[in-house]
Amino acid sequence: MEKNIVIKGAKENNLKSVDLTIPRDKMIVFTGLSGSGKSSLAFDTIYAEGQKKYVESLSSYARQFLGLMKKPDVQLIEGLSPAISIDQKTTNKNPRSTVGTVTEIYDYLRLLYARVGIPHCPVCGREISSQSVDTIVDHIMAHDEGIRLTIMAPIIKGRKGEHKNVISRIKRDGFIRIRIDGEMVRVDEQEEFNLNKNLKHTIDIVIDRIVLRPENRSRIAEAVELAVREGEGATNVLFQSKDEDGKAKDAEETFSTQLACPEHGVGIEEMEPRMFSFNAPYGSCETCTGLGFTLKIDDDNVVTEPSKSILDGAMGQVFSTMDAMGFYRQMLNQLAVDHKTDLSVPYKDLPIDFRNELLHGTGSRKLKYTYTSKSGRVSHMNHTFEGVIPSLERRYGETNSDYIKEKIAGMMTEAICPTCHGKKLKDTVLAVTVGGKNIIELTDLSVEQAILFFEKLELTPREQQISRLITKEIRERLRFLKQVGLGYLTLSRAAGTLSGGESQRIRLATQIGSGLVGVLYILDEPSIGLHQRDNDKLLGALRNLTDMGNTLVIVEHDEDTMYAADHIVDIGPGAGIYGGELVAQGTVDDIKACKESITGQFLSGARKIEVPKTRRPGSGKYLEIIGAKQNNLRNIDVKIPVGKLVCVTGVSGSGKSSLVNEILYKGVASVTNKLQEKPGEHKEIRGIENFDKVIDIDQSPIGRTPRSNPATYTGMFDPIRDLFAQMPEAKMRGYQKGRFSFNVKGGRCEACRGDGITKVEMHFLPDVYVPCEVCGGARYNHETLEVKYKGKNISEVLEMSVTEALPFFENHRSIEKYLQTLDDVGLGYIKLGQPSTQLSGGEAQRIKLATELSKKSTGKTLYILDEPTTGLHFADVEKLMYVLNRLTDEGNTVVVIEHNLDVIKCADHIIDLGPEGGSGGGTIVATGTPEEVAKCEKSFTGQYLKKMLR
């Protein structure tokens, strides 16, 4: 086997024909400035080629079902292994995905509970055992006389297939009726049953249909006996009767000769792993379908401005835009008459009874009124009033319009399911225990608590023999999660609430558990979101992978990871068009010795981010959060000084995001920005009057499509289009500003609709994107491109970098101010028209920061940033600090969640949470200046900070 991976002529994105040789079975770190080409080399070249070669080994039939990658722009790569990418972009937003399901621990738990779980009666809690046929018959006979019974044997339960053999066997055995997916059919009247083989089906044999009478007991007993024989111990009995109004009232019960409570007759099916899945209908709660929550419209989300009257917009557009002669408006008038109230008074002053019926309906109470149509026709009405909220919920369920669904969804909040109380499963499933805990109670434990649970778990010798392999797998997976610094996470934690770093480390733990050998792993900043204290554990886990015989390529900026690496590759020297070259490679000492390497300058100490000589005094005012209880926060009171750069620190899982993102941002934004999302649990926030707005500057993309770019996002494209519309050629032709937009008809190329590229479908090969043959990739039509400013057309301007555009637009302040702030935050290399899909998270965040800097400051803005150093090199952090200091110097307050010590040491004030993560966190460990926090021996942040301040 070859000892090296050899890359020749890599030209993907900004790479300038890079030739590189890296050792196999080692830990290799790719570093360099944000936008220098690290990810282009690691992910878009090495991983893409490895993936492409694997996919090419499959049949063309299999290839058409895979998300194929385009061939990277590289001459040659030799010595590649099968490649696995572990990046930060694949966080699962599915509300059904949890830490337990993603790591497959939950699959093993389901198997464990199905095999050694002890079932209990959900009513009385006693252990339950099987029912005899006599017991089942006694239970049936206890129902009201005269009820019609349908006694059935379950044959197929939610399995895919056509099931032709099963149906043929039923017909041969002389049965007349079956129930397929809830519908009764006669097998003797139908030759073929064309079931969709790709869908799951449920089939029951109808054993007998009989009226419940004492004299029919022996016939019922015979039917039950045959049903449990055919249904492998189970029978479904349908009880059919009529209510007082004569409406059909059906109820169905499942009985089993295997498990049932003798006192309450509660029976459960034979325990199978799928019973314990909240993603399958067999065990999931029927009300919330296993989500644990239901969507409800909150009163406060409907009544957005209670100080206004209903007709003036207290409920947004509900009623305020309604025709006075409309049906609902006349009903509203009658409701007001009934309550002797005036619709012109502010909503908050209306009687409570009226407000309640307005929102939730009149129930059975009917309104009597005279309705006059627009044509003058008069009708006498007598009916109930549905209520605004039930009406919206009904429309949400009935409408096919995405627009209406989206509008109503914005008013909805998650409410804990009233049936399962957030437990996701049926009560019969929750009554099965192992070690005294049901499966949901076990997943509510943190990883560390679960490890202790399995260490102390006592099982009988028989149960130990059955579960030995299952518990071994569970213990190993839990240990790997703890090893990568995720011991504080609960197994029930929703995957969508994890940070990019957390989800990446979960996948890393899963890979360690897989035990693969000879694989090329490519990781994207695994240290993100990890406190310095936990870095050693992560590096140990990474070293495990290489010791097993794997190659690790890690895109990373963390100093500890660089020192732990066997080989470092530094890409640069700059970013964008100024990067894409191999600056240095080798050991840490080799990088330090390279004078051209900016990374080497920081590692050697020749260049560093200085500690501020003084800390800002602030305004003397405070933003106070009282009684913060969200997630693991322990009813804490937090004081945030106004007019300072504030860092919220602490180990992973200590409660930083709960405090800042859930309570602080949503709490302040609900007042200043009219945000409708409900803030995290707390008593109150004081001092909001010190701010006119709050802005959350995260690393999410500035747009989801290639049409979004830095010029459109910052607002710079408007004055650029204005400028082109003022050119003599444009005026002569009558071109307006809209002519220079590639998003609307008129000036854009209609062949590609302003995209500049067209897609060629290749079926079992990846789709190929080629420049538009009409406009050549320019995005505009020929006539529009004839209008020029200083010799350049609009398409050529979008191809300019920020650095090139600065002198080009030097006399236009409305454009220059945007360019200058982009250059100030270190983005001089990006193109004005660079598609948002090609920007890294760090670049997107700095574009947002530049946009804020270009606005006129009020000095009363609260800025919130969650780990802004993600994806940033030492030199990029230097530029970030310049921006954060500028924002703070203008009188604004900046609150940053951060683990990076270079940022923390520059803060005016630190709030350190902990001391541990999960249940061991949620308290304030230390507050004050970096110097004050460094003196706190209980603070892990303080211990590391002390070294930085020397």
Kindly label every feature range from the protein language model.
Residues 1-950:
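Conserved phosphate-binding elements of NTP-dependent enzyme cores
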